[in-house]
Every structure is written in structure tokens, then in C-alpha cells.
């Protein structure tokens, strides 16, 4: 289930403050964050946010289509290496 509409969207305060400072100064810097739970607001559009995936920070460029989604959706935490291939030698 999603978040209740009466509660509204959530974003960490420290992330919002960093975005506001960059918007007032018209700067474009990469913002490192561990907050995968934060919702993307329209003020985030045009910025690059480096979201932590458990090993490293993955740079995510925010576009208008991403508004309303969570930051963690764009930084996958698991790497899929594929299923084991057929071993042709053991079939003989």
C-alpha cells in the first residue's frame, strides 16, 4: 500500500535544504544522499543526486517524469548476474 494522501509526500529536511541552497545560487552540483526514502519534488528537477545503493553512490539526474517517485527506485541495490548457463560437456 502507498502512503496516505492526507499525510502528503515526504522528503528529508537535510536534502530539501541542500536543494533550496543550490536553487537560490543557481548552481549545479552532485548532492550525495543516503535518503532513498525521499520523494522527488518538482524543485529537484535538473539536479543530480547521488543515491547510496549499499556499496556506492549512484548518480541520478532528476527529470520531470521522476516527480512523485522515490529516490531509491532509480538506484538498484541488487545486481542480477544471470542464470547458470548450460554446461555442454556434462551432457555427453
Curated annotation (Swiss-Prot):
<keyword id="KW-0699">rRNA-binding</keyword>
<dbReference type="Pfam" id="PF00203">
    <property type="entry name" value="Ribosomal_S19"/>
</dbReference>
<dbReference type="InterPro" id="IPR005732">
    <property type="entry name" value="Ribosomal_uS19_bac-type"/>
</dbReference>
<protein>
    <recommendedName>
        <fullName>Small ribosomal subunit protein uS19</fullName>
    </recommendedName>
</protein>
<keyword id="KW-0694">RNA-binding</keyword>
<dbReference type="GO" id="GO:0019843">
    <property type="term" value="F:rRNA binding"/>
</dbReference>
<dbReference type="GO" id="GO:0005737">
    <property type="term" value="C:cytoplasm"/>
</dbReference>
<dbReference type="InterPro" id="IPR020934">
    <property type="entry name" value="Ribosomal_uS19_CS"/>
</dbReference>
<comment type="function">
    <text>Protein S19 forms a complex with S13 that binds strongly to the 16S ribosomal RNA.</text>
</comment>
<dbReference type="InterPro" id="IPR002222">
    <property type="entry name" value="Ribosomal_uS19"/>
</dbReference>
<dbReference type="GO" id="GO:0015935">
    <property type="term" value="C:small ribosomal subunit"/>
</dbReference>
<dbReference type="InterPro" id="IPR023575">
    <property type="entry name" value="Ribosomal_uS19_SF"/>
</dbReference>
<keyword id="KW-0689">Ribosomal protein</keyword>
<dbReference type="GO" id="GO:0003735">
    <property type="term" value="F:structural constituent of ribosome"/>
</dbReference>
<dbReference type="GO" id="GO:0000028">
    <property type="term" value="P:ribosomal small subunit assembly"/>
</dbReference>
<comment type="similarity">
    <text>Belongs to the universal ribosomal protein uS19 family.</text>
</comment>
<dbReference type="GO" id="GO:0006412">
    <property type="term" value="P:translation"/>
</dbReference>
<keyword id="KW-0687">Ribonucleoprotein</keyword>
Amino acid at each position: 500500500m502507498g502512503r496516505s494522501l492526507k499525510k502528503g509526500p515526504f522528503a528529508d529536511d537535510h536534502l530539501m535544504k541542500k536543494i533550496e541552497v543550490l536553487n537560490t545560487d543557481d548552481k549545479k552540483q552532485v548532492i550525495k544522499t543516503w535518503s532513498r526514502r525521499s520523494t522527488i519534488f518538482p524543485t529537484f528537477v535538473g539536479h543530480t543526486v547521488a543515491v547510496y545503493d549499499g556499496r556506492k553512490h549512484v548518480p541520478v539526474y532528476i527529470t520531470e517524469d521522476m516527480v512523485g517517485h522515490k529516490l531509491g527506485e532509480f538506484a538498484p541495490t541488487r545486481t542480477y548476474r544471470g542464470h547458470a548457463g548450460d554446461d555442454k560437456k556434462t551432457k555427453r
